[in-house]
């Protein structure tokens, strides 16, 4: 008989999942706020803007109409059609709505792609630094992340000639993210073309995380779909449309892979939320003025934050032109980014993300998010300047 005092026997692979260090920072900040301290949050990677009113109204209208049932496991056809039309308008790419699978956010989309592709010991090539969840997805499914240490002056992007050195008989996919988290960098067309050539020559698909697509402030933006069909694109509405809590994403994949991913989706998730899909249609088909206004505000914040960080002695060797992050080198102060972020939080009440959250390739770095008001960013920069200025004056490394 089961005893309430028995210990649960948990799987080793679940215990091996690494934590989000940023959550430790956030939770510590929340405790401090509960005690009455004013904390400036520069660690959170989500828009501070509300979702546009016309998107909210579409969801409300859908609920009133009774759009609260299961949908097709691939998602509403009008939403899939709107997605492929969006890619055509932006990039001139002809896609079929039947290549699209709607998911409850981008993370389930990534998980579904990895579940469809990976066998035990299969390798996935990815850059280091990387988004924290990537290795956990791969390892949990029995795969092996293969890390390519990348160069900040190239925006920490995978370079084709370097990637070739990491190919093996076990390579199952190459994973890219542009615009990127944590760096806020946009991959060049040359890099995308080179990686696409590898995919086509070797028969190795590229998994492209494009969740920050559209959040770009300088230069041209491209998608891997311009250069190869041998790709699984994962995208969503969270960042560009300020819809993080709505949980709406999608996969664009080769036609021959749709049925496999659809079956997995049916078993694990069934379908995405019906009225949220209706909101997604409104987001894509409605006015984009709200998005344009957000991008202008983000850009002003980006320029201000970058200038202030450089002025206080942090190094940013390539200008970030996408997403809403600045990844700054703080190694003149400390090689331990987690302890440094704790000190900043405790001493001056600013929450920032330690670089170690994104792999040892970002250790000694700090990630700053400008998805906060300009007033809060200014206050945060003033506090950081006081923190780093004191340590410059004392002329010593904190750790």
Identify the residue ranges that each predicted region occupies:
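Conserved N-terminal alpha-helix of the aminotransferase class I/II PLP-enzyme fold
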Residues: 70-103
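A glycine-/small-polar-enriched, mobile loop at the entrance of the PLP active site in fold-type I
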Residues: 40-48, 61-80
């Amino acid at each position: 008989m089961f005893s309430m005092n028995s210990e649960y026997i948990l799987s080793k692979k679940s215990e091996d999942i690494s934590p989000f260090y940023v959550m430790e920072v956030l939770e510590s900040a929340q405790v401090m706020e509960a005690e009455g301290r004013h904390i400036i949050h520069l660690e959170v990677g989500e828009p501070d803007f509300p979702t546009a009113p016309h998107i909210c109204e579409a969801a409300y209208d859908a609920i009133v109409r009774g759009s609260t049932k299961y949908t097709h496991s691939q998602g509403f056809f009008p939403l899939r059609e709107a997605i492929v039309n969006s890619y055509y308008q932006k990039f001139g790419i002809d896609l079929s709505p039947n290549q699209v699978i709607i998911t409850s956010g981008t993370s389930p989309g990534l998980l579904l792609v990895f579940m469809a592709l990976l066998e035990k010991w299969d390798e996935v090539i990815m850059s280091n630094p990387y988004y924290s969840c990537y290795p956990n997805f791969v390892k949990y499914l029995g795969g092996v992340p293969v890390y390519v240490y990348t160069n900040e002056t190239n925006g920490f992007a995978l370079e084709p000639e370097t990637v070739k050195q990491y190919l093996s008989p076990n390579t199952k996919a190459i994973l890219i993210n542009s615009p990127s988290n944590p760096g806020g960098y946009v991959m060049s067309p040359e890099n995308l073309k080179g990686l696409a050539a590898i995919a086509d020559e070797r028969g190795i698909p590229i998994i492209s995380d494009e969740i920050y697509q559209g959040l770009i402030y300088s230069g041209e933006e491209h998608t891997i779909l311009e250069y190869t069909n041998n790709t699984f694109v994962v995208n969503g509405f969270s960042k560009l449309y300020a819809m993080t809590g709505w949980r709406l994403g999608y996969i664009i994949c080769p036609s021959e892979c749709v049925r496999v991913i659809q079956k997995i989706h049916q078993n694990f998730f069934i379908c995405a939320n019906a009225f949220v899909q209706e909101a997604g249609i409104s987001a894509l088909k409605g006015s984009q003025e709200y998005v344009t206004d957000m991008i202008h505000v983000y850009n002003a914040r980006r320029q201000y934050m970058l200038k202030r960080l450089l002025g206080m002695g942090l190094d940013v060797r390539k200008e970030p032109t996408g997403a809403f992050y600045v990844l700054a080198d703080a190694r003149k102060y400390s090689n331990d980014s987690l302890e440094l972020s704790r000190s900043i939080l405790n001493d001056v009440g600013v929450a920032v993300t330690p670089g170690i959250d994104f792999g040892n390739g970002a250790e000694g770095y700090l990630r700053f998010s400008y998805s906060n008001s300009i007033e809060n960013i200014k206050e945060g920069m003033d506090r950081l300047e006081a923190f780093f200025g004191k340590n410059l004056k004392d002329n010593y490394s904190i750790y």
